[in-house]
């Protein structure tokens, strides 16, 4: 992919501008893409249908919350949880570049990032907990 005159992000000879996803991130990326396709996409229309009939336009319909909680449980069970955290103990140890590829996939579906515990403001709060939280707080919240 060209990003300017003579600059290609996937050109292996240009190490200073290598913006390709690392080989180590590929399995997680593939798992996220698969999860979105098989778990998130099939319930997205229902999620939006429920949102259109909610009483509180500042909150979620109870059915929407149920959909999200079920997706979150499945994601956590598959290990697709907190992978945006750079620390390999609490996250996947991804670089910002590798996470960018995954975030791009999350951005294609309006409920994907929430389903995989990667949406604001939660991500920022978890980053703080990762850095300064007690072991007990990390165990409970991360």
Predicted regions and their residues:
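Short, conserved phosphate-binding/catalytic loop or strand-edge motifs used
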Residues: 119-126
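Amphipathic, small/basic residue-rich leader segments at the start of a protein or domain
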Residues: 1-119, 131, 136-140
């Amino acid at each position: 992919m060209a990003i300017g005159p003579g600059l290609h992000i996937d050109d292996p000879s240009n190490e200073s501008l290598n913006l390709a996803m690392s080989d180590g991130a590929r399995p997680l990326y593939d798992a996220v893409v698969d999860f979105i396709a098989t778990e998130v996409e099939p319930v997205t229309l229902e999620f939006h249908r429920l949102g259109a009939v909610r009483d509180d336009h500042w909150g979620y319909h109870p059915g929407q919350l149920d959909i999200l909680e079920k997706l979150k449980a499945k994601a956590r069970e598959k290990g697709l949880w907190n992978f945006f955290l750079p620390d390999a103990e609490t996250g996947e140890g991804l670089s910002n570049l590798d996470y960018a590829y995954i975030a791009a996939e999350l951005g294609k579906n309006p409920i994907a990032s929430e389903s995989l515990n990667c949406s604001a403001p939660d991500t920022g709060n978890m980053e703080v907990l990762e850095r300064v939280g007690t072991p007990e707080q990390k165990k409970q919240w991360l």
